[in-house]
Curated annotation (Swiss-Prot):
A probable RNA chaperone. Forms a complex with KhpB which binds to cellular RNA and controls its expression. Plays a role in peptidoglycan (PG) homeostasis and cell length regulation. This is RNA-binding protein KhpA. Pfam families: KH_KhpA-B. Residues 29-75 form the KH domain. GO terms for biological process: cell wall organization; peptidoglycan biosynthetic process; regulation of cell shape. It is found in: Cytoplasm. InterPro entries: KH_dom-like_a/b, KH_sf_prok-type, KhpA.
Length: 75
């Protein structure tokens, strides 16, 4: 999933070479921390958080299990 998320993010940002995704488990949740160029933060979050919410929904559907997903954008 980490690789898929990186590929999607690289397709929507202006600085794809700076995209870094870290994946880990925290308190029974799957957590993805995203590091992008400061100029790309708004693009990743989207208007009213729509882009980041869509990414979360997509990953949840692909994982197909009951594990909750959290996506954090780190600067």
């Amino acid at each position: 999933m980490k690789e898929l998320l990186e590929k999607i993010l690289r397709g929507i940002v202006k600085h794809p070479e700076e995209v870094v995704v870290m994946e880990f488990d925290e308190e029974g949740k799957k957590v993805y921390e995203i590091v992008v160029n400061e100029e790309d933060v708004g693009q990743v979050i989207g208007k009213d958080g729509r882009t980041i919410k869509s990414l979360k929904i997509l990953l949840s559907a692909l994982m197909g299990d009951s594990k909750e997903i959290t996506i954090k954008v780190v600067r």
